[in-house]
Design a protein with these regions (language model features):
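Regulatory and interdomain segments flanking nucleotide-handling catalytic cores
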Residues: 1-233
């Protein structure tokens, strides 16, 4: 089996052109990093990803065990973006949704019939499951200002679905409550950086990095990832 991660940016229409362009640039840079040198920081992850229409993400992973870590890396990348407060109250409500949730992501686990990276074509059970879940969320939440979940796990294997869904539901709560700075620290920890490396990168002291790491629940997240990676896919 393989994995596909499908995702769409929450309230992307509330971002101005410069913000949206920066977000797209950051996502594409991340995709290029995985694709160009999959062994850098994240380990050997056979990976292909692309951005569609500026706010829809699709990523293929040969190894399903790596899918949750990559999903969290994407999630934290989006959520660590800082937005200025808008004077328009209606617009600010939408921008707050982006700040809180960032991006909806669905992990689909299943077979893949076609993985054509040259043509950008992905087809098969895994992408059908992840894509359908995101499409369902986009339509059901179209007129709502309350979003219940933003991380999903889909597979036709009942036992695996039960195991995976419990894990992503718990992580969803942690990340929804995380601040932009906490997500930034978590993002680099997920990529394999040490707290010392992160402190230098963010130009803060290591104690501050450790404080954010503890507040976001890094130990629990790390244990959850290790458990997920040992599931029988």
């Amino acid at each position: 089996m393989n994995a596909v991660i499908s995702g769409d940016i929450v309230s992307s229409t509330a971002l101005n052109e410069l913000e949206l362009e920066l977000l797209r640039k950051n996502v594409l840079q991340l995709i290029d990093t995985f694709t160009g040198d999959p062994s850098a920081q994240t380990g050997d992850i056979p990976f292909y990803g692309h951005l569609i229409k500026g706010d829809y993400i699709e990523c293929y992973l040969k190894e399903p065990k790596d899918s949750l870590r990559v999903a969290l890396i994407i999630k934290t990348l989006v959520k660590m973006m800082v937005l200025e407060k808008s004077p328009d109250n209606a617009l600010e409500k939408k921008r707050l949704l982006f700040k809180k949730y960032g991006v909806r992501l669905a992990i689909g686990i299943g077979s893949m019939r076609t993985v054509d990276t040259e043509q950008g074509i992905l087809d098969g059970e895994a992408i059908y499951l992840s894509g359908r879940k995101i499409d369902d969320q986009r339509s059901s939440n179209k007129e709502k200002v309350v979003i219940k979940n933003t991380l999903f796990f889909e597979t036709t294997e009942n036992k695996l679905k039960e195991q995976g869904s419990v894990l992503v539901d718990l992580l969803d709560v942690l990340l929804t409550n995380a601040t932009a700075r906490q997500c930034e620290v978590l993002h680099y920890k997920l990529l394999g950086f040490t707290e010392s490396d992160i402190a230098q990168k963010l130009e803060v002291n290591q104690a501050a990095v450790n404080q954010h790491s503890t507040a976001v629940g890094w130990n629990s997240i790390e244990h959850t990832l290790k458990y997920y990676e040992q599931l029988e896919f």
